[in-house]
A protein has these predicted regions:
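Amphipathic, interaction-prone secondary-structure segments
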Residues: 45-75, 157-182
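Domain-length accessory/inserted modules outside core catalytic folds
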Residues: 121-133, 161-162, 200-204, 211, ...
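Short Lys/Arg-enriched alpha/beta "domain-start" segment
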Residues: 2-59, 92, 99-154
Length: 225
């Protein structure tokens, strides 16, 4: 299962140097092609999306992503969020398509795992700590209760873990739990992220890392507003 940056590595190995924007565009193009060549009814059913067929013969996929209804027009592959005129970030388009392309539709296991327990998670962990955990600590370490308010914008709900914790359904089959422990004179604030073990059947570890980073930044933005 290719992640957001994997395509660039393949191109560089072939002697083609890509800019970050090139990398994302290649990944986006490949993900679009894969979805168009798939059984759309099956992909929609497994991912928890809705496939609508228009009178014109064109189709529309609707998928919940971070508490928003996102739409994909087929076969043009135009993507956007319902009720918003803002251009969807390319990283969001890629994550949505990767989820649609790879979700196996398994029921949640109820077994929580840490980032390090994901395939190759130990290798990605330094980036995860820098881009997800540290921003959460900086934004909410002194006031963990604010995390609960920030998460409401993303459809999050409070859970009884740590000093404050929230579970956010990034996608229909992808709950992510963010946990904070408040610091004191002896200990620094800490943060952790837990996933249902079935996340490996929906997204690559690289995609999970990017997804967590973006959720953390959205909540941090709320805290700074």
């Amino acid at each position: 299962m290719a992640g957001l940056h994997s395509v660039a590595g393949e191109k560089i190995n072939r002697g083609l140097l890509l800019t970050p924007q090139d990398n994302y565009q290649v990944a986006l193009d490949l993900a679009c092609e894969q979805l168009l060549n798939s059984d759309l009814s099956e992909r929609s059913a497994k991912s928890g999306a809705v496939l609508e067929k228009k009178e014109s013969g064109k189709e529309l996929i609707k998928i919940t992503f971070l508490n928003q209804i996102c739409e994909i027009k087929l076969p043009s592959m135009e993507m956007g969020c319902a009720g918003s005129e803002e251009e969807m970030p390319v990283w969001a388009k890629i994550l949505i398509l990767h989820y649609l392309n790879h979700s196996q539709g398994l029921p949640l296991s109820g077994k929580w795992i840490t980032f390090r327990q994901l395939p190759g998670g130990s290798g990605y962990y330094p980036a995860h700590a820098k881009r997800t955990l540290n921003p959460l600590i900086n934004a909410f370490g002194s006031n963990p209760e604010f995390l609960i308010e920030a998460a409401k914008l993303l459809g999050g709900r409070a859970v009884l873990l740590g000093d404050a914790a929230v579970t956010i359904f990034a996608f229909p089959h992808v709950p992510i739990t963010f946990i904070l422990w408040k610091g004191d004179e002896e200990f620094s604030p800490e943060a952790n992220v837990l996933f249902d073990s079935t996340i490996t059947e929906n997204l690559s570890t690289e995609d999970v890392e990017v997804l967590c980073q973006m959720v953390a930044l959205k909540m941090k933005k709320w805290a700074m507003s």
